[in-house]
Amino acid sequence: MKKTSIAIIFLFMGLQLAAQTKYLRSIAETQELSKDVVSLFKENNIAASFEQLTPYWPMPQNELDAIEEKTIKYLNIIRDRFGKPIDTLKIKNETIADVALRETYLVRYENTAIRIIFTYYKNDYGWIVNAFKWDDSFTEEFE
């Protein structure tokens, strides 16, 4: 009986996790999500940006929470040191056939910029966030 109960609990947990995952239906939707998240980054509304990403990013919630917390901390430091955000700029769009897409943006501050990279993967159900990264290494974008 215990084994059955445990199996049922894990089944419901698995169903709950699967039910939480949403899929983007097109590249246009991935681009819209990226643009919205970057705009929220510029406004320093990190909590809202993660709320936008989370339904499409199959990652444990505790890991997402940790990334969000660190992002809030470091973006506040960037704003204090390098001034207010000025604007955003999409700088690159890369694809691997019809299965992967990477979009790169800059959020420009008064005295520096941060780079935001979204990687999307297309599975049988649609597009998901495969990776999301931001850093201050925008100079790596020079060719």
Please tell me what each predicted stretch does.
Residues 5-6, 19, 66:
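Intrinsically disordered, low-complexity segments enriched in glycine/proline and serine/threonine
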Residues 18-43:
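Short, low-complexity N-terminal intrinsically disordered segments enriched in polar/charged residues
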Residues 4-15:
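Sec-dependent N-terminal signal peptides
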Residues 17-18, 60:
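A short hydrophobic/aromatic micro-motif that marks alpha-helical segments and, especially, helix-coil
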